[in-house]
């Protein structure tokens, strides 16, 4: 391969051109110096979670912000009142509900990220996402956010990765390629990129081996 061909591949490889923009989105929660700043920081992060993962729930923000269920509901209901979220009641969520972003939230997220948001609003908010994937999406969101918010036992900040790309973002980036879809990708602290695959349904060892071998084959082709 010539140096010109190598340069072409690098300049047209999403790993070098598109992924960094998403990896650089700040998804770490910082409480803030006062209650006002705390509220602003929570509002921004909750909107980003809803936009990037399609949904957000009281369970996610309760864990992330270290608050109880009542305060988590108050926080999300306030964002709903402000026109940033809409609530959908569903038994598929551990909280009995999920919150989906609005067009206003999409425009707000664009300002925060500096990235265009591909958003389609629907009069019926329950049609904005696949209810069969609620648990999968919530587990995915927890895992990716957990890696950003990792601490040692002495409270020393020790993130497992510095940023991530969600499944919807990954699909949009690789829309016209034959890249195998993953549940997300993370940028590790050494700058390397790792794929995230969430499997919350039971599969025996043989089934898991088949899946992993398919991923290995895809990696060797890329």
Where are the language model's segments positioned?
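Short, flexible loop/turn elements at secondary-structure junctions
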Residues: 54, 65, 188, 200-202
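Catalytic cores of nucleic-acid endonucleases
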Residues: 200-222
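Short histidine-centered catalytic/ligand-binding loop motif
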Residues: 128, 197-199
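Flexible, glycine- and charge-enriched loops at secondary-structure boundaries
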Residues: 69-72, 133, 205-209
